[in-house]
Amino acid sequence: MLNSARTVLARHSARQLYRFRGCLVHQQRHRHQVQRTLATHVQRHLPASLDDKALVALFDQPNGSKLRSPFNTTGLFGHPNLTHPRALVSLAESTLVRAQLLTQRILEAGKSEHELAKVVKNLDRLSDMLCGVIDLAELVRNAHPDRLWVEAANHAYETLCEFMNVLNTHTGLYEVLKQVLSNPTLVNSLSPEAYQTALIFWRDFEKSAIDLPPAQRNKFVSLSSDILVLGRQFLENASTPRPPTSIKASDLAGLKDKGMGVRLQLQAQFTNRDLQIYPGSLQAHMIMRSAPNEEPRRRLYLAANSSTQEQIEVLEALLKKRAELAQLVGRESFAHMTLDDKMAKTPDNVTNFLDALIDHTRPFARSALRTLAQRKQAHHGLSSLPIIQAWDRDFYCPPDPPAPPIPLPPLTLGTVFMGLSRLFRHLYGVSLRPVPSASGEVWHTDVQKLEVVDEDQGIIGWIYADLFARRGKASGAAHYTVRCSRRTDDDDEQGDGMFEGAELQILESQEFEAVKRHRLPNQEGVFQLPLVVLLCEFTRPTVSKGGTILEWHEVQTLFHEMGHAMHSMLGRTEYQNVSGTRCATDFVELPSILMEHFLNSPAVLSLFDADGTSTLRQIGNHHHDPCHAIDTYSQIMLAVVDQIYHSPTVLDPSFDSTREYGNLQNTRGLIPYVPGTSYQTQFGHLFGYGATYYSYLFDRAIASRVWSKVFSKDPLDRELGEKYKREVLRWGGARDPWEMVATLLDAPELAAGDAEAMREVGRWRIEDEVGVGGRH
């Protein structure tokens, strides 16, 4: 039932009792820019500190700048015992024994009101106890270069996940929690954060068919297992290369690309054979952008969007199993079940949002489509406007690489980190400080350790940055929360129970948890502080070329990931189950998308200049891209498809995913559906973001509004940053996100989070320059 931490955001839609905190996985996506009027006034700002400047040397110098302590030796992440792979397996076994003792304590809590009052705290402790090892193991599985460590991490991961699966459907735990929530005195004694945590546990149990008879509960477990297997198969199918298509050399006459295009034509002439072009290859992308003849583009589009019957059947089986699972627990559809604890709440509200967004976006998209039709008309010398087909989009509007809003000097990785640290100091009084890692603390020499330092409270967390590409490391950009915030001084561990010999068995787990606990100034209690890891795959610096120069999309990616990281750092709650990024799926992307908006401000961009010697030019750096609206509209259509596929419709015996997709394209889409295509089998987010694909559009709309209404005029204003931290970031998932947004925007009418609130968000203009393909 539990899923990989690498897709934790996608799993928040089915919050398990013991969820992974995990990481946020984000695929890079094309961004198309729109023209903006940018203020050229650069505000007065705090000078770069020595720590800020040290970040430049840390990340830009290939040798000599790597901070290592020659005198200290420890284990992974500073845990003294984690010095070899066997220690990770041993830690998992110790944690399992300790978790079993705590589980037994919770099960016996009904014997006294004193113990019942501690049930929510103990459930959260149990979740953290298991997740602390599982999330560390998940990071090791995806980043450690040593195969023995990876194998040990797999073993630890599987051992504890098996126990978590038992807890997720444990009727005894459910009954104890029911006893707590049925007691008005106990409920009134819970803090708002504790009560929210209790409700999350309660909903998790109910989604696990906990109150059903044994036969139906077994059916739930069976369906959940089927869904996991089908989901993995679907993702494998989605990434399977499509077969090549045959292209005649004569069809490539007049290619606009004079490099690769000429080489392809010479190859065809030399072999005297048709070219075999694989969809998704560099050659295919070149042809889609450069071939004046429509036929090779059409053939490649058909090949790229083809599916086997088996691939379609796997997807439809997955959708049907999900629908059956939802109906088993008394819900009308999988969307109804999934959206219950989201901002949207119901499928109807998602429809309200998407309909409003469609109404707003359609005029811009149609205008852009008309521009493309005019280009096609001129190209073919036609007397009337032709229809734009799916294979015309890239030829008449070639995708441009993302570019900054104003000309900038080359930005190195270290320079961008310096700018981030300076931005965080302006907004939150928080900065990044390089610190030496001890021998054995990190898993590769590339990894750098940063302290996150608050000007009043000191160290509030740690970021381990593993930023350079290498063999065996997970691809893409990712944010892993290895450890969440949690208050620990009220754990009452002495009450967990014991049996003969258990003291030694649980010692490793106790020592593991004791690391990184701190008493912060001006804050009651002792806290476990957050620890996150950033994984990227940038080019490493070299002696000959110097620091890594980032492309603009890489700068955007880094800002996006650091938005998640600061959410983890500032969302320091007393309960780990609601800390940092552990919030609703349709809210969690807001901080990361908002961070990308800051890159539209010259005042923020000036923070990349440590000495204030560079001059920002007034002239904009890019042209209007008419296809931005088309791409946004296409993403809205995918969100609508996602809702259709998770509605009661899928249980109709005549359900056909291809027919539904084609009908939507022909009735509400911009470009006609192409018979014979079935893109849905490649829409991988249908698994990870099932019934919640709207979330990214939703958070884009909210982030655009927050930027324009709160930050755009003065993005370095400390009062605004403190308001955002106070009203949004510090709560993690412990507060209703609608209340957070309503307070931040001074829009009390949004607080209800009802159908009208969803429609209102749909009417907001998505004013970002952060593209359309979801990072998630």
Swiss-Prot record:
Cofactors: Zn(2+)
Q: What class of enzyme is it?
A: hydrolase
Question: What keywords are assigned to this protein?
Answer: Hydrolase, Metal-binding, Metalloprotease, Mitochondrion, Protease, Transit peptide, Zinc
Give the EC number(s) listed in the UniProt record: 3.4.24.59
User: So where does Zn(2+) get bound?
Assistant: H560, H564, H567
On the tree of life, the source organism's domain of life is Eukaryota
GO annotations of cellular component type? mitochondrial matrix
Q: Which CDD domains match?
A: M3A_MIP
A GO molecular function annotation here is:
metalloendopeptidase activity
Q: What is this protein called?
A: Mitochondrial intermediate peptidase
Question: Which organism was this protein described from?
Answer: Coprinopsis cinerea (strain Okayama-7 / 130 / ATCC MYA-4618 / FGSC 9003) (Inky cap fungus)
Coding gene?
OCT1
